[in-house]
């Protein structure tokens, strides 16, 4: 039996590994397309080797979900090359609002009156991001374009989450694991044409790519999949919020990159609203006698 303490430490480790993605992406001299392709290629191999459950039961329903995840992986890397890591992760964290808005059409799940407050809070957070302009710096040379790419990654991430829920309704086991493998494999293939040819590939670049594929994605997913079934959903969700919280810290340490006050306020509002909404949903499910 898995130790409760060990399971929680594994989720914390996964969140912290995920959070280093922004800083690591900025460390390579490669293009965003090259980083996205090579990182995902390594991650797909690692996940396939490390997670036996990801090798079984593939079917056509995986494809649209894997495409959405592949787009998320690519867009997130491209966004991190152009805007601050804080902006990239905070804007991607808006995904739950799109899941709510798409729910009536994709999942036949209605938007409840109580969800309106969450939608309004996230909308206000988004408004703070896009009000005014941000100054370009070496680690974030085109914040406006990067913010749009990060926003797009939030939408594709929402499509992936909705797809996983759709797969779950069809009783598919380990859908998340298989999607992680297929999505990374697709991201590798889709970004590869734009990644070639490669010029000036250094030992430092190789180290960054290996770290991203082996640890930031591969080991993080291994920790998460080992632990997630042993930790209550709300507790796991709360611990995984370490990712958007820690990501700006790593880039500040490495590059002295600081998000604007507006972006920081918007990010805190989005994360706080998500946590409150998750807690409220958990309480409502408990009151209804649902797991």
Question: Where would I find each of the regions flagged by the language model?
Answer:
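Hydrophobic/aromatic residues within transmembrane alpha-helices
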Residues: 28, 35, 79, 105-107, ...
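Specific transmembrane alpha-helical segments of multi-pass solute transporters/efflux pumps
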Residues: 17-22, 53-92, 100, 124, ...
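Transmembrane alpha-helical segments that form core, pore/gating elements
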Residues: 15, 47, 99-100, 136-198, ...
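Hydrophobic transmembrane alpha-helices of multi-pass small-molecule transport proteins
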Residues: 47, 69, 101, 114-134, ...
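Glycine-/small-residue-enriched transmembrane alpha-helix faces in small-molecule transporters
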Residues: 1-37, 67, 75, 124, ...
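Specific alpha-helical transmembrane segments that line the substrate/conduction pathway
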Residues: 34-37, 41-45, 77-110, 114-116, ...
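Juxtamembrane helix-entry segments on the extracytoplasmic side of multipass membrane proteins
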Residues: 4-7, 29-37, 55-59, 131-156, ...
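Helix-helix packing/entry segments at the starts of transmembrane helices
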Residues: 9, 88-94, 164-186, 217-253
């Amino acid at each position: 039996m898995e130790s409760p303490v060990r399971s929680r430490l594994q989720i914390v480790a996964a969140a912290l590994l995920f959070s280093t993605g922004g800083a690591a992406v900025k460390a390579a001299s490669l293009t965003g397309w090259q980083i996205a392709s090579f990182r995902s290629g390594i991650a797909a191999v690692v996940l396939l080797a490390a997670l036996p459950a990801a090798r079984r039961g593939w079917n056509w329903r995986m494809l649209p979900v894997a495409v959405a995840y592949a787009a998320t992986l690519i867009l997130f890397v491209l966004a991190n090359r152009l805007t601050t890591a804080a902006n990239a992760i905070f804007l991607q964290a808006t995904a739950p609002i799109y899941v709510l808005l798409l729910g009536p059409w994709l999942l036949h799940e209605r938007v409840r009156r109580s969800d309106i407050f969450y939608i309004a809070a996230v909308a206000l957070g988004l408004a703070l991001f896009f009000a005014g302009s941000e100054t370009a710096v070496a680690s974030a040379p085109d914040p406006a374009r990067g913010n749009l790419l990060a926003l797009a990654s939030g939408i594709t991430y929402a499509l992936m989450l909705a797809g996983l829920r759709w797969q779950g309704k069809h009783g598919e086991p380990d859908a998340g694991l298989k999607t992680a493998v297929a999505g990374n494999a697709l991201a590798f293939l889709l970004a590869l044409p734009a990644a070639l040819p490669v010029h000036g590939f250094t030992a430092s670049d190789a180290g960054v790519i290996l770290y991203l594929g082996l640890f930031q994605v591969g080991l993080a997913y291994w920790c998460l999949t080992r632990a997630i079934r042993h930790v209550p959903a709300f507790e796991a969700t709360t611990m995984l919020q370490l990712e958007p919280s820690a990501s700006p810290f790593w880039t500040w340490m490495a590059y002295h990159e600081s998000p604007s006050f507006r972006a920081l306020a918007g990010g805190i509002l989005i994360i706080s609203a998500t946590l409150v909404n998750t807690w409220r949903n958990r309480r409502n499910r408990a009151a209804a006698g649902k797991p």
